Each structure stands twice: as C-alpha cells, then as structure tokens.
Amino acid sequence: MAEITSAKAMARTVRVSPRKSRLVLDNIRGKNVADAIAILKFTPNKAAGIIEKVLNSAIANAENNFGLEKANLVVSEAFANEGPTMKRFRPRAKGSASPINKRTSHITVVVAEK
C-alpha cells in the first residue's frame, strides 16, 4: 500500500471574505511551512491569523496522524472556497434599504513532504 505523504486541515464557515483570504493564501502556496508561518505572522490581515491556525492544524495532523517530519513539509495546496452568505439590510433614505452581504469562507490547507 502507498505511504501517505500529505495531511489536510480545513476551517469551515469562517467569517472572512473568500476574496481577501485568497490574497493571503497566494503568498504561502508552495513555500515550506516555516517560511509560510513567518509570512502569516507578519501579514496585517484578519485572514492571516485564521489561515495560520489552519496551517498549524495541518502540520499537527501530519506529525501526529502520519508521522511526517515538520522540517520536510511544504504547503502543497491552499485554497478558499465560498461559504454561506449572511444577508443583512442597511436602512436608507425614504424608507428604502440596501443589502449587505456578509461573506464566509471554507479555507483548506494541504501540507506534503517535499
């Protein structure tokens, strides 16, 4: 049977826009995990903190579940899909209202051995 060389972690229905999450994920894709964590620590963005948690979870999954070495891991996949949108309304002039879409993301990070 083939040996497992990757581990995955997901955060579902996170209250951050997928578009903004993708900007951060593009910075870490393909990097080794130590560099990716350093990049996320110094990224001044709400999504960066959430993505850092997901990345640390993926690293822990790799170490504990599959016995992989942290030093050999790279971020092989990192993507954000759209979650459910919470729809709200802001009151406007003359009794009208404007819609507000509070978007959510499903963030997935996969780490693999190089």
UniProtKB/Swiss-Prot annotation:
One of its GO terms (biological process) is translation. GO terms for molecular function: rRNA binding; structural constituent of ribosome. It comes from the Bacteria. One of its GO terms (cellular component) is cytosolic large ribosomal subunit. Coiled coil: none annotated. Gene3D superfamilies: Ribosomal protein L22/L17. Keywords: Ribonucleoprotein, Ribosomal protein, RNA-binding, rRNA-binding. This protein binds specifically to 23S rRNA; its binding is stimulated by other ribosomal proteins, e.g. L4, L17, and L20. It is important during the early stages of 50S assembly. It makes multiple contacts with different domains of the 23S rRNA in the assembled 50S subunit and ribosome. Belongs to the universal ribosomal protein uL22 family. Part of the 50S ribosomal subunit. HAMAP family: Ribosomal_uL22_B. This is Large ribosomal subunit protein uL22. It comes from Streptococcus sanguinis (strain SK36).
